[in-house]
């Protein structure tokens, strides 16, 4: 079912821009419409893509507030968003303009386009010349799993009866999606352990074959 990236990136963009999540549309780009990336392997989509979206939305928000400030004849720093698609003067909610009106004014009256770009890269870890150590990943999964199973003494068949998972996930932006990831990851582990091809049954050529 995937990592739910469209849902979580909509949440991030909506909160940053101060608009309802229903007003955010995520376009799944390909190499025709967007740059290349390395993918969101290992359930890292929220960490990587989420930070990029946050930066892009912050840049777009700054431009949006500048455009709204010009329309309301105030300083951009005096403006706030209400999360419902409105921009208003702090302390004076009646002096407001909608995000839609701001975008239209920016495009057709001010001659600017409201757009943000964001990129998130984790710095490469160099090997310490003295210790030989390095940081192989940017974040770790702090977790514990206990699996209850039964084994048939005669056939060796394994049956998993229960999986108990405990994770420290930090701040969950979407708890339902996190739960799905944990359940999916647990069953993926079971799949690897019980159903994937085992290298113990893989015949490799040796010197005896020569």
What are these regions (language model features)?
Residues 1-202:
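Cofactor-binding beta-sheet edge motifs in enzyme active sites
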Residues 201-210:
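Single conserved hydrophobic/aromatic residue that forms the stacking wall/gate
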């Amino acid at each position: 079912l995937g990592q739910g990236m469209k849902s979580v990136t909509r949440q991030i963009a909506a909160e940053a821009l101060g608009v309802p999540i229903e007003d955010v549309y995520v376009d799944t780009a390909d190499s025709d419409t967007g740059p290349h990336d390395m993918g969101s392997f290992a359930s890292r989509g929220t960490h990587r893509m989420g930070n990029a979206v946050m930066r892009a939305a912050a840049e777009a928000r700054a431009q949006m507030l500048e455009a709204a400030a010009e329309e309301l004849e105030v300083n951009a720093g005096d403006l706030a968003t209400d999360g419902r698609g409105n921009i208003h003067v702090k302390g004076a909610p009646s002096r407001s303009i909608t995000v839609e009106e701001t975008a239209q004014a920016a495009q057709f009256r001010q001659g600017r386009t409201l757009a943000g770009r964001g990129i998130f890269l984790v710095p490469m870890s160099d090997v310490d010349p003295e210790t030989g150590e390095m940081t192989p990943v940017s974040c770790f999964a702090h977790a514990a799993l206990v699996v209850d199973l039964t084994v048939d003494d005669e056939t060796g068949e394994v049956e998993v009866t229960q999986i108990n998972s405990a994770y420290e996930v930090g701040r969950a932006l979407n708890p339902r999606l996190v739960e799905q990831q944990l359940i999916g990851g647990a069953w993926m582990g079971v799949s690897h352990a019980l159903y994937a091809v085992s290298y113990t049954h893989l015949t490799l050529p040796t010197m005896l074959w020569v």
